[in-house]
Amino acid sequence: MTADFDKTYTDWSIDVGTYKYEGITLNEVEQNLYAIQDQEQDFVVISPSNAISIDNKQYNFVQVCSDQDTDLLHIEISVTNNGDRGAIIYGKNEQGPQEVLKIIEDFIVHNKMPALDSWEIVLDLRPKMESYVKDSEND
């Protein structure tokens, strides 16, 4: 069953850089995806007011921009493992607007995310562990 594309999801926002608004519909999400594909805008960030917890992970936002090598879309998902500081941003290239819309619809309506095993790690914002022991000057 497909979600109601005109229903307003009040705990979600859309940010396109020049403006951000709270309370979004899937119809607005779809319009933004096609605007990116048509190169009318650079990106869209879709985020919940609070991170969504799924399988011991916190999902913070989804960002979509044009794929550099094709006329398709690039999608990124920000994930923080429970107990970790800092997010990992996963990305996937060459996605059509309907594929991306399905991922976003599942996130907004059903609090579901695809398995990210095959996705590329675009950015790892977790703090690095120190692999050395500092010498103490006060010994």
Predicted regions and their residues:
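Acidic, proline/glycine-rich low-complexity IDRs
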Residues: M1-Q41, I52-D139
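Generic secondary-structure microfeatures
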Residues: P48-N50
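A short glycine-rich, His/Asp/Glu-containing loop-to-beta-strand
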Residues: V44-I46
